[in-house]
Amino acid sequence: MASESGKLWGGRFVGAVDPIMEKFNASIAYDRHLWEVDVQGSKAYSRGLEKAGLLTKAEMDQILHGLDKVAEEWAQCTFKLSPNDEDIHTANERRLKELIGETAGKLHTGRSRNDQVVTDLRLWMRQTCSTLSGLLWELIRTMVDRAEAERDVLFPGYTHLQRAQPIRWSHWILSHAVALTRDSERLLEVRKRINVLPLGSGAIAGNPLSVDRELLRAELNFGAITLNSMDATSERDFVAEFLFWASLCMTHLSRMAEDLILYCTKEFSFVQLSDAYSTGSSLMPQKKNPDSLELIRSKAGRVFGRCAGLLMTLKGLPSTYNKDLQEDKEAVFEVSDTMSAVLQVATGVISTLQIHRENMGQALSPDMLATDLAYYLVRKGMPFRQAHEASGKAVFMAETKGVALNELSLQELQTISPLFSGDVSCVWDYGHSVEQYGALGGTARSSVDWQIRQVRALLQTQQA
């Protein structure tokens, strides 16, 4: 049990710890997030001790009852921290002793805070991954529903931020939804690797007291058991993977936010954010600022920083547990909170977004059909490279004459290639343009419908 100082490790120390060091060393301010899973892990471990003959049935029941009381106090916000509670494990064990007496000292038999904390963290992150998966699926569903409802809306697609080709608005939505399905799949994979039990590894060498780790695994519903006690207590691959998942997901969300920030400017006027996700200016009354999207974009940087910071912490550590690993939890808690907020705000933005169909249509221009003009010649038998050059000459001719590409006469086009004929007029129809891209993954309606079905099927599979 704890020494007179209240420390779980104080037996070989003489004198008090410097108060500045006390504060520097403590993690209770943030690892209190783990109170519930710490109790959960301790209850499972007490059952393991009872099976190993290290606790009597009465002692186990006493500990379990005491842990239930500890959990009740946390849940009701009546748990009182002590100045000596340097972390959640110390706090819970100290309170357990106050409730049930010296029997509490048997709970830590064969267990180290090294395997205890990493078990707690895996339990907490496992639940967090499930919660975030649900939020991410809801965002993707919202996007797919919107894509299905607005399939007939056309607007300019951009490359290099220059107008490129006509596409369906739904095609743009789905481009981001598909990226997010990879994120949702990746998060499930991260959760699978989180779901491995380290409890029973001790500090470094393992557990010498015949504690049944399979029992612990079943009690805590883990999918597997760690293979090596040294690796189990010191590796934080699962934390790094989670932070990388968040970084990549935020990359995708930030890019979508950037598109929408541009689209809602007066210069584009393709979309309008709901007032619920906008703010105003303290000086300029006319302003409607896309703060929700700007914050999504900026919070990506915070998440990246947490990921990079953890990797910098891990890369120089010697084998097994080092106190440096205390830094992992703040990163996990902050990023989890950020991702939860971002996913919910993004869902709200997408579900309430207003589109300006007329402005989208007016932004389409004949020069965006230059590629279609080349395809017209390809269908007439011209090799694509020659067709590309011929279309480029038509663009140059229109620019020289100061007219739109579709205003060139048939005779003028025929000076470029005799393959041009009266049916070239069909090239200038935007609806015809998007419908020719019928290959799977394209912007034709049939392909967009296929994409919608595929994304919904992916979601169904992931949620199974």
Curated annotation (Swiss-Prot):
Highest taxon of source: Eukaryota
Reactions listed under catalytic activity: 2-(N(omega)-L-arginino)succinate = fumarate + L-arginine
EC class of the enzyme, as a word: lyase
Pathway where this protein functions: Amino-acid biosynthesis; L-arginine biosynthesis; L-arginine from L-ornithine and carbamoyl phosphate: step 3/3; Nitrogen metabolism; urea cycle; L-arginine and fumarate from (N(omega)-L-arginino)succinate: step 1/1
Regulation: Enzyme activity is regulated by acetylation.
Free-text description of this protein's post-translational modifications in UniProt: Acetylation modifies enzyme activity in response to alterations of extracellular nutrient availability. Acetylation increased with trichostin A (TSA) or with nicotinamide (NAM). Glucose increases acetylation by about a factor of 3 with decreasing enzyme activity. Acetylation on Lys-288 is decreased on the addition of extra amino acids resulting in activation of enzyme activity.
Catalytic site: H160, S281
Residues carrying N6-acetyllysine: K7, K69, K288
Molecular function via GO: argininosuccinate lyase activity
EC number: 4.3.2.1
Binding-site residues for 2-(N(omega)-L-arginino)succinate, renumbered to this chain: S27, N114, T159, N289, Y321, Q326, K329
Membrane spanning residue stretches: none
SUPFAM superfamilies membership: L-aspartase-like
Record PTM N-acetylalanine, positions in chain: A2
Keyword Amino-acid biosynthesis: yes
Residues at the site labelled Increases basicity of active site His: E294
Quaternary structure note: Homotetramer. Forms tissue-specific complexes with ASS1, SLC7A1, HSP90AA1 and nitric oxide synthase NOS1, NOS2 or NOS3; the complex maintenance is independent of ASL catalytic function.
PANTHER family: ARGININOSUCCINATE LYASE
Protein name: Argininosuccinate lyase
Lineage: Eukaryota, Metazoa, Chordata, Craniata, Vertebrata
